[in-house]
Amino acid sequence: MRREALWDRLYLSGIDGRAAELARENGLGLEIAAFCYAPNLEDPAVLSAVRSDMAGLDRFWFHAPFAELAPCAIDPLVRQVTEKRYRQAADLAQDLGVRRLVIHGGFVPQVYFPEWYVEQSVLFWRELLAELPPDMTIA
């Protein structure tokens, strides 16, 4: 495959503070990673910085928070927090005009039996995905 064929599918992770600048210089997409840390979803300063990073770019992935979030949690309260944070991420991505989200499934083999995980995943994701815009991609 030629280099040009891949170029429009390459994204730099915003974890690196220079990612937006490098993406602009090289015609790459940007993965917005500032919201991997859930409290940043509610921080106006972080949102402002992300908007600045997005300037001059046109291809994005939005990385939702994941630490301590578990869609298949045994504890219903943990599941509620997870749902809240994922909804916040999807809403914020939409507000930013981003239609592609990275959301971790939360499988921890030392904690969940695979059967439980699959069963609970279907319940969790069916409800959440039904509320997202049809043009939004979750990976």
Region roles according to the model:
Residues 1-88, 94:
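N-terminal pre-domain/capping segments
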Residues 73-139:
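Active-site acidic/histidine proton-transfer and metal-coordination neighborhood
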